[in-house]
Amino acid sequence: MAALGGDGLRLLSVSRPERPPESAALGGLGPGLCCWVSVFSCLSLACSYVGSLYVWKSELPRDHPAVIKRRFTSVLVVSSLSPLCVLLWRELTGIQPGTSLLTLMGFRLEGIFPAALLPLLLTMILFLGPLMQLSMDCPCDLADGLKVVLAPRSWARCLTDMRWLRNQVIAPLTEELVFRACMLPMLAPCMGLGPAVFTCPLFFGVAHFHHIIEQLRFRQSSVGNIFLSAAFQFSYTAVFGAYTAFLFIRTGHLIGPVLCHSFCNYMGFPAVCAALEHPQRRPLLAGYALGVGLFLLLLQPLTDPKLYGSLPLCVLLERAGDSEAPLCS
C-alpha cells in the first residue's frame, strides 16, 4: 500500500507561531496531553467493543444463532453510544472541527453516490483474480448465477441467516463506525492524516485477537496454530484497516468503507495456494496480477477528493493550520 504512505507520514505541527493559542488544532490542551486523550479514547472504544462480546456467559460456540443474536445486541449498543466518546473527546480537548459531529464521522449526503460505488469498484478490481477463480469453480453459468443473486427468495434466506447478517451487515457497519468514523477524527488532529491511517488499524487488528479465546475454549486447533493464525489475522486486518481508513479520509464518507468491508468479508482472503494448483492456473494468475496492477493504477484517481466534495477531516486540519495535508488533494 505504498500509495498510502510517503509524504503523508509527516507529523502535524502544533507549535507554529502564527497560530493563536485558541486554535482549533488542539483547543486548550497542549499537544502531548491532546494526543494522550485521543489515544486513550480510541483504546477505550476498542476495549468496549470487544468487551461487549463477552458480557453474555455462554458455553456455545460463536457461530451459534443464540450467541450471534446476543452479540448483535451488545455491539449495536456500543456502536450507538460510540459517537458520545467523540463528543466527550471534543469537549475535553476543546477542538472545534468546523462541521457537525455526524458530518465529521462520514454521515453526509454530498457525494454519497460516488462514495458508495467507486471504492467498491476499486476493491472488486483488486479482487479480480479471486472473482475469476470463484467464477471458474462455480457449477452454474453467469445467467443462472445472476438469477440466484437477484431472486427475492435468496435475499430472504440471507436475511434470516444469523451468520450472513453478522458477516455482511452488522460487523462491517459497527466496526467501521467505531474503528474508522469515531477513531480517525480523534487521531488526525494529533498526528496528521498519514500516521492516523496506519495507527487506527492497530486498534482494529488487536481487537480481532479475541478470536484466540474462542479457539482455545473449544480446542479448534493446536496452541501454536491458533497463535500463528491470530498473528496472520492481525496482519491482514491491519492492512485492510489502513485501506478503509484511507478510503474514509479520501471520500469523507462511511458508506464506502462499510460496503468494501462487507465485500471483503464475503470474499475472504484470496486462495493463492489453490490458484497455483488450479487447472487454469495461467489465466487465473494473470487475473490476480492484472487486478493488483489496475488497483494500484486506479487507487488515486478513483479516490480523488474532488469527486466527493468537501472532506470533513481535511476541513478539521485546515482549521488546525495544516492546509497542505497530502491525502486531502
Swiss-Prot record:
InterPro entries: Rce1, Rce1/LyrA-like_dom. Keywords: Acetylation, Endoplasmic reticulum, Hydrolase, Membrane, Protease, Transmembrane, Transmembrane helix, Ubl conjugation. Changing residue 326 to A: In a breast cancer sample; somatic mutation. The active site is at residues 175, 208. It comes from the Eukaryota. Protease involved in the processing of a variety of prenylated proteins containing the C-terminal CAAX motif, where C is a cysteine modified with an isoprenoid lipid, A is an aliphatic amino acid and X is any C-terminal amino acid. Proteolytically removes the C-terminal three residues of farnesylated and geranylated proteins, leaving the prenylated cysteine as the new C-terminus. Is able to process K-Ras, N-Ras, H-Ras, RAP1B and G-gamma-1. This is CAAX prenyl protease 2.
